[in-house]
Amino acid sequence: NLFISANTDVHGATAHDHGRSGFDRPMTLIFAKEKTLESVREALEAKRTLAYGFGAVCGEEQLLKDFFTASMKVTVNRIGTQNVYLTVTNTSSITYVLKRGDSNQVKLAPFHSMQFSMPKTRETFDLTVLNMYSSKDGHPTVTLNY
């Protein structure tokens, strides 16, 4: 019944190695309400943490969904006769590996955008985030609104 955390087994200075391996160093993301020791402790006890490392984010499913949704900006480019054309922008520093329905997986790089078209009759669409884990094989599926 512990909070999720990320770490390494490196025994020494790692500052000069960041970026060389192609991955960011592991980090524990703590969602504290304030910048105080008490607030950090409360967040840890409430298990409001995510582990980030080697291109993956792990944690409780709802927190993963909220984190991903907060990282995305959805813009309607134009509305056609049958489809709505959207831009989804990743406003975070994390590359996301996404899958929509039966389509191929795609990578959405940090601070980059991709285009989607959706039937005009829908107001939401689902993306499964393949580099987020809520269990060994569990990836959250997030509903985005436009």
Where are these regions (language model features)?
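Charged catalytic cores and adjacent phosphate/nucleic-acid-binding surfaces used
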Residues: N1-Y146
